[in-house]
Each structure stands twice: as C-alpha cells, then as structure tokens.
Amino acid sequence: MADGGSERADGRIVKMEVDYSPTVDQRLPECAKLAKEGRLQEVIETLLSLEKQTRTASDMVSTSRILVAVVKMCYEAKEWDLLNENIMLLSKRRSQLKQAVAKMVQQCCTYVEEITDLPIKLRLIDTLRMVTEGKIYVEIERARLTKTLATIKEQNGDVKEAASILQELQVETYGSMEKKERVEFILEQMRLCLAVKDYIRTQIISKKINTKFFQEENTEKLKLKYYNLMIQLDQHEGSYLSICKHYRAIYDTPCIQAESEKWQQALKSVVLYVILAPFDNEQSDLVHRISGDKKLEEIPKYKDLLKLFTTMELMRWSTLVEDYGMELRKGSLESPATDVFGSTEEGEKRWKDLKNRVVEHNIRIMAKYYTRITMKRMAQLLDLSVDESEAFLSNLVVNKTIFAKVDRLAGIINFQRPKDPNNLLNDWSQKLNSLMSLVNKTTHLIAKEEMIHNLQ
C-alpha cells in the first residue's frame, strides 16, 4: 500500500507500528534448520507466535514472509494435512493482513502445479478455493485454481462437472486480471458449454467478449478459437449467414492470409454459407461484397457458383449438380473440398438446403420477369411437382421475399402487387396530363403546318 500502509481483512488501512524484519531474518533460518531435523510442529508453533506479533504491529512484509515460510516448510516435509490446516488457520486469523494472505495463496498455487498425487492436489485446491472465496484481492488466484480443477475433472471424463465449476467464475468483472487472460477464461467456458451441448448458456457467455479485442496484437490464436467456437454454436442454430460472417473474420486474419491453403478453405466456406443463407437484404449485400474479392479468381469453381446466384437467370438443379457436385462434395487434388457438404447428417442437410436455395432463387427470378404464370408451368421450370412448387412459393410469400397470389381453381399465380388506390389515381392523373400535353403540342404543330401551307 502507499505510504507503508497495509489493509486488514475488515478493510481498514493501517500503518506499520514496529518493524520486525531483523527478528524475522534471524528466526526463519533457525526454524528452517529445525524443520529439516523433523521438529516441524515445534517450528510452526514458534512461527505462529511470531506471526501474531508482526500482524498486531501491522508489519505486512514480515507477516507475509512468515506465512510463506509456514506453508513452505509443510510442503517440503510433505505434511499435507498440516499444510491444509495451516492455510485455513492463517487466512482466518483476526485482522489478518490481505497482502500477507495473497502472498501465501500465490506460494501455494505453485505447489498445486508441482504436486503429482491427484487426491492431494485436489484437496489442496479445495482448501485454497475455500480460503479465497469472496475475496477480491485473491480473485485471480481463485480463478486459476478453478480452471485447474475444471481441467482435472474434464481429464477424468466428468465434462459436465468441469463446465459447472468453470461457470461459477464471472471473470469479465475481474478488473485486476489482464484482458487476454479474461478472454482465455471465457473461451474455455464456451468450449465446455458446447461440450455438454448447453447452447443457450454458450450464446450468453459469447456476448461477454467484445470482438474489437481481436484487433490488438498477439490475439490471433484467441480470435481463431473464438470464431471456431461460434461456428460450432451457429451450426447447431442453423444460422448460415452468421457462420458466413465468422468464416469471413477467420479469412481476414493475417496468419490465415499468410497460407494459401488456409485462406482458400476459409473463402470457400464463406462462399458456400452465404449461398446457403436464405435471401434477404443483408444476405444480398454480403453476396455482392464477397463477389468483389479478387482472390476468388484462384478458386474459379466457387466464383462461378456464386455468380449463378447473382445472375438474373433460372438455374437447373441437375445441371448444377453435374457441374459442381463433385467439386463441392469430394474436391480435387488442386482444390480440396470443405466439410460443408461432407458425408455426415449435417452435410446431407446442407446439401438439401442448397437445392432449396436454388429453387427459391428461381422463384424470385420468375416473380421478377412474370406477372402471371400457371402452376404447371412453374413446376415444370423448377423441376418439381405442383405441390412442392406451391410449398416453396408459400414459404417465400410468408417470409415477404416476394409477393404472389394463387388462384387455385384456375391454377394461376399472379406476381403483380396490387397498387394503392391513391397511387393508382396519381398515376392516371399524371398519364392524362402527359397525354393532354401531347395533344396540345400536336394541335399546335398541325396549326403551324396549315399556316405555312396557306402562305404558300
């Protein structure tokens, strides 16, 4: 603390009254020697007596040294019960100095890493988590211990318990923790939530990360981990447009751009997922922005596929499968396939969705160029049955992608949007004015011609 002040457990700031450094300098080597001779209990009693004096005098440095010495001697003697007992005792002493407890906990955290016996390690972690609970000044140490415990639980196959333990931490509120470490903790929470298929909690946790953080230096690994986790989350949600955006973020990462194979795979995924996304203004805008990427020249098949969806022409599904099916699903030596249309249940579902996007594209083209069309003719153009065509059409109308009215008895679809009466009247008035102006001009020209001919 500033000006030699120390903070007690009750929050009071106190100044050192007596400096016990010379006494501690003398006693600690003596105690260490006695501890090695097997007189540990006697040594601890001596140090606890000295600790009371230093604590009462608010000598933070000396108190810290004594607390660290006690746990160190217990650790070196492998007296695990005594170690846990003294950690609890020293942290709960009346008016204990916060900085001294923090030093002791930090020392014990190094022992957690060194201990190989699992039951002993778990007991020490539990003790340390107990003494650090609710104490802001050791919140970072508690977070690290909790992460270690979660890792052990996961390694033992108890992933659900690991996720539950790590979710206790609200690291986004830890002001003393570095931003990078906070993000690492949150990503680990996301990973474990996904592992136990807790997608709602994963979505909530993901919002704790501000993506602007990834613009900072040395954050590329964390950025890739974050977006890969988000892709897994949105795969479950079936949000293709979000997945496309995540792949774009991966594609724009310098370490991905540096390797041709990696950026090509990322760009292929960007193209495929933007095509798979249902049509709306945002999707349309993204398609045109992606189309402008010059690097698409290096993956021509994917560039041509994207162009099909921006060209105002009908597509035949059978032709698309013939031209692009092998490239998209199996790939080639020069251009490996992505996992988008892999031989999995999800891959098959996305392949079916691609066919749906082709049908929807074709219906939008018809709505653009036709005012009316029969159901049979539309089904013929779509290579579908009449019922399937009607189902697709209904879906697009419900989503307000197009406007259409179906006369079931006549079997005719009308794509022409009914005009507002006011607009209709305004159009009629404008056209009538235009016609009358034309008649007046024509009359004037005729009169002019007659006058010229009369003069002659």
Curated annotation (Swiss-Prot):
* Species whose genome carries this gene: Pongo abelii (Sumatran orangutan)
Per the entry, what this protein does is:
Component of the 26S proteasome, a multiprotein complex involved in the ATP-dependent degradation of ubiquitinated proteins. This complex plays a key role in the maintenance of protein homeostasis by removing misfolded or damaged proteins, which could impair cellular functions, and by removing proteins whose functions are no longer required. Therefore, the proteasome participates in numerous cellular processes, including cell cycle progression, apoptosis, or DNA damage repair.
Q: Which InterPro entries match?
A: PCI_dom, PSMD12-CSN4-like_N, PSMD12/CSN4, RPN5_C, WH-like_DNA-bd_sf, WH_DNA-bd_sf
Matching entries from PANTHER family are given as:
26S PROTEASOME NON-ATPASE REGULATORY SUBUNIT 12, 26S PROTEASOME NON-ATPASE REGULATORY SUBUNIT 12/COP9 SIGNALOSOME COMPLEX SUBUNIT 4
Quote the subunit structure annotation: Component of the 19S proteasome regulatory particle complex. The 26S proteasome consists of a 20S core particle (CP) and two 19S regulatory subunits (RP). The regulatory particle is made of a lid composed of 9 subunits including PSMD12, a base containing 6 ATPases and few additional components. Interacts with ERCC6.
Q: Where is this cross-link: Glycyl lysine isopeptide (Lys-Gly) (interchain with G-Cter in SUMO2)?
A: K92
The residues covered by the PCI domain are 242-420
Q: Which GO terms describe its cellular component?
A: cytoplasm; proteasome accessory complex; proteasome regulatory particle, lid subcomplex
Q: Name the UniProt key words of this record, in alphabetical order.
A: Acetylation, Isopeptide bond, Proteasome, Ubl conjugation
Q: Which family does it belong to?
A: Belongs to the proteasome subunit p55 family.
SUPFAM superfamilies attached here? Winged helix' DNA-binding domain
Positions carrying N-acetylalanine: A2
Quote the SMART domains the UniProt record gives.
PINT
Positions of transmembrane segments: none
Q: Which domain of life is it from?
A: Eukaryota
In chain numbering, cross-link Glycyl lysine isopeptide (Lys-Gly) (interchain with G-Cter in SUMO1) is at: K92
- On this chain, the residues bearing N6-acetyllysine are K221, K368
Q: What is this protein called?
A: 26S proteasome non-ATPase regulatory subunit 12
- The gene it comes from is PSMD12
> Pfam families, from UniProt?
PCI, PSMD12-CSN4_N, RPN5_C
